């Protein structure tokens, strides 16, 4: 088995890393966080110009026609630089679903705009009151005039700037389908608030809001298809966050002296840093296993939950440890390492906590599908 990236994947990683790197200095990140939208639109334009936003968009819609692996590499680079742009939301949650399930009209309407950066997409996949993401509380009502949705999509990332949001909803027939809701319509209210990572999310309050069903509908298996890719995308970002925070901490421990010697020579500090490295290695191998299974059509459900569990558990542990290893300066909320802790905490609890995913792993073990 060849574990090396292809030449094309290396190119994507280097391209995305270069673009994010030009916008990832601490001063610029702080300026974006102080802005009204918490959305780096200059970076978004550069990502579009570089072709990163069109990675999964088919060539006939002005994209590169690549897969989830290439997007995951770009997401990892975003995590390294903790840049506030809706790459996961637009490309994974939005474009992938449109490519897979959208009608020709839906694809021609949205995919070229995704590729050129003129459209932002999001998805309302958080539904804490439902107990499980496969049973959404938003209700869809069909009529001769089309579909309308009523209910609230909770904590929708970047909904405040999204042109359209994908919303899973339960129909009167008892099925679960995915709908596309344009945010500028009547019956749509966005109640925004700041997230832990200093970005912005919004509750999407729908009151008989006009909606368009995605393709021919979305049953539970198809919703699971989208959720699995969403979880792997989150694991990709968290991997970048953790790897970069460990790298920065290693540099700090080597440069910072105490009692005339580098902190890295202290066994207690070295052991904690080594544990962080082990966590990131476990995060990486489980992430790639889940991604490989998804890309090759193998059973992936249990592997995806394992990857997301490591992303949540390991990522949060790494974030808190590296902040502790920075000593007093780690408590400074303006110091760069603090931003990585905030991102790790946000990612760890997005679309299910470590405990929730551990429960799903247990279900797969008990059911013989792990």
Q: At which residue positions do the language-model features occur?
A:
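Amphipathic, small/basic residue-rich leader segments at the start of a protein or domain
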Residues: 1-85, 363-370
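Glycine-rich phosphate/cofactor-binding loops in nucleotide/flavin-utilizing enzymes
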Residues: 2, 12-13, 328-370
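Glycine-rich beta->alpha junctions and the first turn(s) of the following alpha-helix
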Residues: 2-14, 80, 188-281
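C-terminal helix-coil-helix/basic helical segment that borders enzyme active sites and/or dimer interfaces
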Residues: 27-35, 250, 254-262, 277-310, ...
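N-terminal glycine-rich flavin-associated loop
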Residues: 85-104
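A short, Trp-centered hydrophobic/proline-enriched beta-strand micro-motif
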Residues: 117-128
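A short core secondary-structure module
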Residues: 124, 152-188
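A structural signal for short hydrophobic beta-strand segments in well-ordered beta-sheet cores
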Residues: 138-142
